[in-house]
C-alpha cells in the first residue's frame, strides 16, 4: 500500500513539476509581453506628446488663419465696393461711347466699301502690269530656247538629208571609181614598169594611199596621220605608214610598203613560164609581207589603241586581183593573221564608212552640246519660274503690309492721321496740310472728343 501511495505521490509530483515548468514558461512569456507592452506604452506616450505639440501648432495656425481671413474679408468688401464703382463708371462710358460707336460704324462701312473698290482697282492694275511683265520676261527666256530647238531640228534634218544624198552619191562614186580604177590599173601597170627600186615603190604606194585618203574626205592631222613613231614594250621603234583615227580613241594601221617587183616582172615577161614564175614570186612576196606585218603586233604598242587588224594597202588594183586569182585563199589566210588586204577601191569604200562615222560623231557631239545647253537653259527657266513665284509672294506680302500700314493711318480709334490732325487743331504749328481724302477716311474727331478719350 505504501508503495502504491509513493508511486501515486511520485506521479503527482511529476505532474506538478510539469505544471511548474509550464507556469515558468507562461511567466516568461508574460514578462516578454509586459516588456513589449511597456515599450508600446512609451511610444504611445511620445506620440501623445507629439500630437499635443501638433495640436498646439494647429491652434496657433488656426488663430493666424482666422486673422488673415478677417483681413481678406475686409479686402474683399473693399474690392467689391471698388468694383461697383468701376461698373457704374464703365456703364456711363459705354453709354457715352455707344452713340459715337454707332456713328463711326456707319462711316467705317462706307469707307471700307470705297477702299475695297479702290483696292480692287489697284490690284487689277498691278495684276495686269505684272502679267504683262511676266509674259514679256517669259518670252525673252523662251524665245532663245525655241530658236535653238528650231536650229537643232534644222541641223538634224539637214544631216539626214545630207546622209541620204551621200548614200546615193556613194553608189555613183563607186561606179565612177570602178571606171577610174580600170584606167588607173592600165596607168599603174605602165608606171610599175618604170618603178624599179624598192624605195621608189614604197614612196609611190604611200603617195597613192594619201591621195585615196584625201579623196575619201579625211583630213590629215585630224582623221589620219602619216609616219607616226611608236615604241614597243622592249624599246623597239615602229613607224606605220598611216594611222587612221576612229571615234572612241581607236586607230587603224595602214601599211603601203608591199613589194611589186615580182608583179613588174610578171607584166614584163613575154614567156608563159617566166610569167608563171613571176606570178608565184609575187604571191610569195605578198605572203611574206603579210607574215612580217602580222608579227609586228601593233596592238601592244604604247599609246596606240589599234583595232584587231591591220590594212595592207596594194596601190595597184590589178596586182591585187592577179594575186587573188592565182591564190584564192590569200585573202582568208591574211585575215586569219589579222591582216586585211585592200586595194584603192575597197579602201575607199572603207574610208567612206569611216568618214561617215566621223560625221555622225560630230553630229552626236553637237546634239549632246545642244542637249546640255538646252538642259542648262531649262534649269535657268525653272529658277526663273521659282523667282517669279517668290516675286508674287513678296507682292502679296507687300499688299498686306500696305493695307496694314494704311489701316494704322485711317482705321480705329486714335489712328495716326486723327491724332496728328488733332495736334494741329490744338495749335501745333504746321506749314502743310494732309490731303482731304485721307482726312475723310480717318474721320478726324473734334478736339473736345479727343480730350474725352
Curated annotation (Swiss-Prot):
Q: Which Pfam families does the record match to this protein?
A: RmuC
Query: Does the record's keyword annotation contain Coiled coil?
Result: yes
Provide this UniProt record's keywords sorted from A to Z.
Answer: Coiled coil, DNA recombination
Coiled-coil ranges per the record?
16-201
The UniProt similarity line reads: Belongs to the RmuC family.
Query: Per its database record, what is this protein's job?
Result: Involved in DNA recombination.
Q: What is this protein called?
A: DNA recombination protein RmuC homolog
Amino acid at each position: 500500500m505504501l508503495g502504491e501511495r509513493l508511486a501515486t505521490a511520485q506521479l503527482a509530483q511529476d505532474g506538478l513539476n510539469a505544471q511548474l515548468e509550464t507556469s515558468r514558461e507562461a511567466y516568461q512569456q508574460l514578462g516578454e509581453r509586459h516588456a513589449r507592452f511597456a515599450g508600446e506604452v512609451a511610444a504611445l506616450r511620445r506620440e501623445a506628446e507629439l500630437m499635443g505639440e501638433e495640436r498646439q501648432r494647429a491652434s496657433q495656425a488656426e488663430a493666424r488663419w482666422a486673422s488673415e481671413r478677417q483681413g481678406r474679408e475686409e479686402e474683399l468688401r473693399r474690392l467689391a465696393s471698388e468694383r461697383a464703382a468701376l461698373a457704374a463708371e464703365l456703364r456711363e462710358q459705354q453709354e457715352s461711347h455707344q452713340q459715337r460707336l454707332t456713328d463711326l460704324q456707319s462711316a467705317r462701312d462706307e469707307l471700307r466699301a470705297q477702299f475695297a473698290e479702290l483696292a480692287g482697282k489697284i490690284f487689277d492694275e498691278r495684276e495686269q502690269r505684272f502679267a504683262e511683265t511676266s509674259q514679256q520676261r517669259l518670252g525673252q527666256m523662251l524665245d532663245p530656247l525655241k530658236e535653238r530647238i528650231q536650229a537643232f531640228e534644222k541641223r538634224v534634218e539637214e544631216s539626214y538629208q545630207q546622209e541620204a544624198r551621200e548614200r546615193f552619191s556613194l553608189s555613183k562614186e563607186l561606179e565612177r571609181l570602178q571606171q577610174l580604177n580600170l584606167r588607173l590599173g592600165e596607168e599603174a601597170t605602165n608606171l610599175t614598169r618604170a618603178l624599179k627600186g624598192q624605195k621608189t615603190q614604197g614612196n609611190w604606194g604611200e603617195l597613192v594611199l594619201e591621195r585615196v585618203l584625201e579623196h575619201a574626205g579625211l583630213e590629215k592631222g585630224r582623221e589620219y596621220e602619216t609616219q607616226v613613231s611608236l615604241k614597243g614594250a622592249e624599246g623597239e621603234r615602229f613607224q606605220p605608214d598611216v594611222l587612221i583615227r576612229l571615234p572612241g580613241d581607236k586607230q587603224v594601221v595602214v601599211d603601203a610598203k608591199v613589194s611589186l617587183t615580182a608583179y613588174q616582172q610578171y607584166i614584163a615577161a613575154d614567156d608563159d613560164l617566166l610569167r608563171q614564175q613571176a606570178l608565184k614570186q609575187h604571191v610569195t612576196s605578198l605572203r611574206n609581207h603579210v607574215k612580217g606585218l602580222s608579227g609586228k603586233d601593233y596592238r601592244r604598242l604604247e599609246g596606240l589603241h589599234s583595232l584587231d587588224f591591220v590594212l595592207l594597202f596594194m596601190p595597184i588594183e590589178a596586182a591585187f586581183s592577179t594575186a587573188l586569182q592565182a591564190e584564192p585563199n590569200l585573202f582568208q589566210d591574211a585575215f586569219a593573221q589579222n591582216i586585211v588586204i585592200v586595194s584603192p577601191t575597197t579602201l575607199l569604200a572603207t574610208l567612206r564608212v569611216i568618214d561617215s562615222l566621223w560625221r555622225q560623231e560630230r553630229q552626236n557631239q553637237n546634239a549632246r552640246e545642244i542637249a546640255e545647253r538646252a538642259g542648262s537653259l531649262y534649269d535657268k527657266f525653272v529658277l526663273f519660274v521659282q523667282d517669279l513665284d517668290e516675286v508674287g509672294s513678296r507682292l502679296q506680302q507687300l499688299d498686306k503690309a500696305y493695307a496694314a500700314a494704311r489701316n494704322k493711318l485711317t482705321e480705329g480709334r486714335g489712328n495716326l492721321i486723327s491724332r496728328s490732325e488733332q495736334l494741329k487743331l490744338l495749335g501745333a504749328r504746321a506749314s502743310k496740310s494732309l490731303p482731304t481724302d485721307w482726312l475723310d477716311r480717318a474721320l478726324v474727331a473734334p478736339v473736345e472728343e479727343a480730350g474725352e478719350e
